[in-house]
Amino acid sequence: MRALSEKSGKNSYGLGSFWNGCHSRSERGQEISVLAWVDIEANTAYALSVEQTPGDEGKRQRKRKRKGKANSSAKANAKAKGDKSKSRNANYLDQVCRVASQVKSESLKYLLTDGAYSNKDFIDGVVASGLHQIGKLRRDSQLRYLYEGARRPGPGRSKCYDGVMDVEDLSRFDCLELDKETDLYIKTLNHPRFKRDLRVVVVVNTKTGGYALLFSTDTSLDARTIYEYYKARFQIEFIFRDAKQFTGLGDCQARSREKLATHFNLSLSALNLAKVEQAAANEPDAAFSMASLKRRMFNQHLIDRILSHLDCGQSLEKFSDEYSALCNYGIISQQAA
């Protein structure tokens, strides 16, 4: 997942024009790419890796190369800087491959992405790294049915495909009624542009008639699993929200690449530690709220200050029974405390 952070000035590393999903347009700023570990059972996510996306300098270098106007010194600098001459999609893929090679776990099998990462180069790279990708396809994707009939005898190539999928006719799909307003249709189809078979789930809103196309490179998954996994991807959005509101993700005034990287890592690490603290408090199933945690820590500090000025020990019986209740005063949810 990617997040855009506004940044004033002209000399900070990574400044460029990046897509802002909140405003549905490109805006100038700095972008970070975050890989997160999603806990499906606890319905939360932990930041695993954060890297800053190179800015527009890499684009300018590629344009000069295509036009043949780059001099020898510019080419040498581009070669020395390495990742700046790559496309942004290649930088995202490099990050995934590095993390996949470093994290050895049987539970790490799937990479959950949005539609921006649904392209052939990225999918091929993810599969080559040993992972399966679950993501979203364009609504107008041309998908082909696999031929399931008898093979004809004799020489020549056998029939492989059996027509193009029509969203208006899903009779050849297996249907699962998820709830009163949502039906899931699943089928293994071929994507000609990706040149591979995908497990495709058509999510249909029976009330409005709208639909979305989800996919998985693992053709053994069922419709509910693909849907639940893709829905869990949105927990990463809460990482950006909490980090920007409470741990200063977008407040760094540094300009160098190294200092910015340190700031981004510290901001997301603080958020991870807050979630680990809640899990260690024997509340693994409680809803996480950074605002409630901040309020509770403030209340605890205030009570301790008052007791210290009154020269009263916290172990006194008249304080010990109500201490926890006072610490929880003003929190959003008792479960989040």
Regions found by a protein language model. Give the residues of each.
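Short amphipathic alpha-helical "interface-anchor" segments enriched in bulky aromatics
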Residues: 4, 223-254
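Active-site-proximal, Lys/Arg-enriched surface segment
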Residues: 2-55, 61-63, 182-185
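Charge-patterned, long linear interaction tracts outside catalytic cores
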Residues: 193-220
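Electropositive nucleic-acid engagement tracts
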Residues: 2-10, 14-16, 98-99, 128-130, ...
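Long, low-complexity C-terminal extensions of enzymes
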Residues: 283-286, 292-337
